[in-house]
């Protein structure tokens, strides 16, 4: 595959430059040389070596042949059904007046004309569709006049949009049903295999339990399953109604079912025991005994029976989950005076006095030195309630939905898998919640996640920490009843009410970030809701076949786009893990005397990891306050034409965007492939993979140099797991509403008339990952640390100077 001339500005085919030496990662020597050159002569171009890539333009003959092929394909599709094409394009033929029906001087068959909607028209139509999917004739006429469209075009657009939404929902539901069917088939096969090959529990050899018909075995297994279900339902009913379970015996070991396979007049009756945990788990376990002390065990990867102490612990978990669910629903449905709107931030915050009066604390008394943070946010999300519930109850999918907030998560124990689905599911989970700054430590929380269906299409998912019922458990943060209430709406949307209520030790937080945490912009409901809306919009855009993923013609095919997006996701995840020092990456913190205390330096070794270059990797990160708004700072850092003002990889010149994959209606949410200018005619330019995303709660700009041949393979649909890269980038957050007016005043004093905005300042996190030495056994030197520290300081100063705020 070639890039159709994206890497060369000439009209002819480009020359293969792969013989030029190239290193696609930040290296210690390259950074040191660049910084030295920048310090001596800032106006000169910075040196950088890179390999080449054979990227030729298509000849005119090839383009002509491609045009003929496309034209012939279009004509064949048109002959098969113009009406279908008209509806799939969401375009409509212009209406023909009565005077135009005169066929004396024109062909008998009128020629239809098609019009592609503009992005502005599509945006307005989408906003109306979100509110009303079935507009009446008056609304359609009003839209047609406002958007300069024919009423029939508006009518057909809404018809096609409803059909598209229905198709997407059905596709997703079918996928869920197929997954459930595959799980049931696998479980059925494992059970059949275990029954066909029973094993002796004493000697481990095969055993025969006698002649039992398959129908009888099925009946007894079904009987055992129903008994377990009855026990579990009785336990749940007792908890809901507040009654004791003493009247109904819940077995703590097994259900004994006599089979009667004894022979020869023996007084010892035969039998077998079906052993099952108290609450349903992922897969069954059968223990078969012959009534004489020896047992036959057929195990299918299931836990041991629940002991009395385990049952008592689970009972306490269930009590806590039910109390938390009741509190969450009441808090979500209650407005004033429990929730009041903050005059500083404009968000709904909790009235602590009213909360203490209305609710009893289910997590125990508040610890000394802890501060409370509570917020509430409501909005519509383009996802149905069942899909959102499935995502939240699956730890891996939950982390993928919130990649910048959840660094690591796991399901410790499945206490209850639910009744016929997720209704009643109760999981014990552990998570690491992060804010993209080295000045805010990762929050380690262990909590229960309980899911309950309150009505048709209405679900609630609640989290609550288990510190109050687990002995010896203590942390610097705990979650009070928090979660979301989800209600289905028309057109595949859901109304989500999100509540976040936490208590944390503020002494571990840097003073620069304390206002941000107090007003709920760091871990509050506003940030969770913004991230959910952006991620769901991204998934909808990428799954939609009618939305173009590139604003310009691109040589990337469908498989290439998927591979490129997968590579960008890995790059962003590694960047977040480096900023927050996630436990997934084995970072070791370095304490260097001549490094500023707000700059965190870490190191680790990379060995046998195809996604990273081998050797010693150095990570430097810091956070600073900037007297500019988050949006202005994001637009500056994400603009490829302005990278030469701060990026040493730009070689002192502007970069060119070669490919652009949109991930949302806002063009800023995208993955781009950039080309840096070559230093001289004898060297080829380098490629930079960049992902940018922004929502109402913050923004990130992540980039990494990539190897040109490897990137060419990725754009052809190759496996991106073997592309080695080291990410760097920026995380942008608002400064905290408590100091908005002060920050806005300082911004006016610093910037003057150069773009003052009322939102106040921003909190900018800068992070670099650099390959110091390609030998994993090499030792780290003080000079390497000083070079990385100088790099991060130089970058911050360049950004301040470019935005005219270097005096702050």
From Swiss-Prot:
Disruption phenotype: Defective cuticle phenotypes leading to curly flag leaves and organ fusion. The double mutant pdf2-1 hdg1-1 exhibits abnormal flowers with sepaloid petals and carpelloid stamens in association with a reduced expression of APETALA 3 (AP3) in the epidermis and internal cell layers of developing flowers. Increased cell division leading to cell overproliferation.
Tissue-specificity statement: Expressed in trichomes forming at the base of young leaves, in endodermal cell lines around emergent lateral roots and in the epidermal layer of the stamen filament.
GO biological process: cell differentiation; cuticle development; maintenance of floral organ identity
Extent of the signal sequence: none
Keywords of this entry: Coiled coil, DNA-binding, Homeobox, Nucleus, Transcription, Transcription regulation
DNA-binding region of this protein: 110-169
Domain START positions: 310-541
InterPro entries: GLABRA2/ANL2/PDF2/ATML1-like, HD, Homeobox_CS, Homeodomain-like_sf, START_lipid-bd_dom
Subcellular location: Nucleus
Assembly behavior: Interacts with CFL1. Binds with BBM.
Name of protein: Homeobox-leucine zipper protein HDG1
Organism whose genome encodes this protein: Arabidopsis thaliana (Mouse-ear cress)
């Amino acid at each position: 595959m070639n890039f159709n001339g994206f890497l060369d500005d000439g009209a002819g085919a480009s020359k293969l430059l792969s013989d030029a030496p190239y290193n696609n990662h930040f290296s210690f020597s390259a950074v040191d040389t660049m910084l030295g050159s920048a310090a001596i002569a800032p106006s000169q171009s910075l040196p950088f070596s890179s390999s080449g890539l054979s990227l030729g333009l298509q000849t005119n003959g090839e383009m002509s042949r491609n045009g003929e092929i496309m034209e012939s394909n279009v004509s064949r599709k048109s002959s098969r059904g113009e009406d279908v094409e008209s509806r799939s394009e969401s375009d409509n033929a212009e209406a023909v007046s009565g005077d135009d029906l005169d066929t004396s001087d024109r062909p008998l068959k009128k020629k239809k004309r098609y019009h592609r909607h503009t992005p502005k028209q599509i945006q307005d139509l989408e906003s109306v569709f979100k509110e009303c999917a079935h507009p009446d004739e008056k609304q359609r006429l009003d839209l047609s006049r406002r958007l300069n469209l024919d009423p029939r075009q508006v009518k057909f657009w809404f018809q096609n949009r409803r059909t598209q939404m229905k198709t997407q929902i059905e596709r997703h539901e079918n996928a869920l049903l197929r997954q459930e069917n595959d799980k049931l088939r696998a479980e059925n096969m494992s059970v059949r295999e275990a029954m066909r090959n029973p094993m002796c529990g004493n000697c481990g050899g095969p055993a025969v339990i006698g002649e039992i018909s398959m129908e009888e075995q099925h009946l007894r297994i079904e009987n055992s399953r129903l008994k377990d279900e009855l026990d579990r339902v009785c336990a749940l009913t007792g908890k809901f109604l507040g009654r004791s379970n003493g009247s109904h015996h819940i077995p703590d070991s097994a259900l004994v079912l006599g089979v009667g396979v004894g022979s020869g007049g023996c007084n010892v009756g035969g039998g077998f025991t079906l052993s099952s945990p108290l609450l349903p788990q992922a897969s069954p376990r059968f223990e078969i005994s012959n009534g004489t002390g020896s047992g036959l065990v057929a195990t299918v990867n299931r836990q041991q029976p629940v002991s009395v102490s385990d049952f008592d612990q689970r009972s306490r978990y269930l009590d806590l989950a039910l109390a938390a669910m009741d509190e969450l629903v009441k808090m979500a449905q209650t407005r004033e005076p429990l929730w009041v709107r903050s005059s500083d931030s404009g968000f709904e915050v909790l009235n602590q006095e009213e909360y203490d009066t209305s609710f009893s604390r289910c997590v125990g008394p508040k610890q000394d030195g802890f501060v409370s943070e509570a917020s509430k946010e409501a909005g519509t999300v383009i996802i149905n309630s069942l899909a959102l519930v499935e995502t939240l109850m699956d730890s891996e999918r939950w982390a993928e939905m919130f990649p910048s907030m959840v660094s690591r998560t796991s399901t410790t124990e499945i206490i209850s898998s639910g009744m016929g689905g997720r209704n009643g599911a109760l999981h014990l989970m552990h998570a690491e919640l992060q804010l993209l700054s080295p000045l805010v430590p990762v929050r380690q929380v262990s909590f229960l996640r309980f899911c309950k269906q309150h009505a048709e299409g209405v679900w609630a998912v609640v989290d609550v920490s288990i510190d109050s019922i687990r002995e010896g458990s203590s942390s610097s943060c705990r979650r009070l009843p928090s979660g979301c209430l989800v209600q289905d709406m028309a057109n595949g949307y859901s109304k989500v009410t999100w509540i976040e209520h936490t208590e944390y030790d503020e002494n571990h937080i840097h003073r620069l970030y304390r206002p941000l945490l107090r007003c709920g912009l760091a871990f509050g409901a506003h940030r969770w809701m913004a991230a959910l809306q952006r991620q769901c919009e991204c998934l909808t855009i990428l799954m939609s076949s009618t939305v173009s993923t590139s604003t310009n013609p691109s040589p990337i095919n469908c498989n290439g786009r998927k591979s490129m997006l997968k590579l960008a996701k890995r790059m962003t995840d590694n960047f977040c893990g480096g900023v927050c020092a996630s436990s997934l990456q084995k970072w070791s913190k370095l304490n260097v005397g001549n490094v500023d205390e707000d700059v965190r330096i870490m190191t680790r070794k990379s060995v046998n990891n195809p996604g990273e270059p081998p050797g010693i990797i150095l990570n430097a990160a810091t956070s600073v306050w900037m007297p500019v708004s988050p949006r202005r700072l994001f637009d500056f850092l994400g603009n490829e034409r302005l990278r030469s003002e701060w990026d040493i990889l730009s070689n002192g010149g502007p970069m060119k965007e070669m490919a652009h994959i949109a991930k949302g209606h806002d063009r800023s949410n995208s993955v781009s492939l950039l080309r840096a200018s070559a230093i001289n005619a004898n060297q080829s330019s380098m490629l930079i993979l960049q992902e940018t995303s922004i929502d109402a709660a913050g923004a990130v700009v992540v980039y990494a140099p990539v190897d040109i041949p490897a990137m060419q393979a990725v754009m052809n649909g190759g496996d991106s797991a073997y592309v080695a890269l080291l990410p760097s980038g920026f995380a942008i957050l608002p400064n905290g509403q408590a100091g908005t007016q002060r920050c806005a005043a300082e911004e006016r004093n610093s910037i003057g008339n150069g773009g003052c905005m009322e939102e106040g300042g921003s909190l900018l996190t800068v992070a670099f990952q650099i390959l110091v030495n390609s030998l994993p056994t090499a030792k780290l030197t003080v000079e390497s640390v000083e070079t990385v520290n100088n790099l991060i300081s130089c970058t911050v100063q360049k950004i301040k100077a470019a935005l005219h705020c270097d005096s702050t």
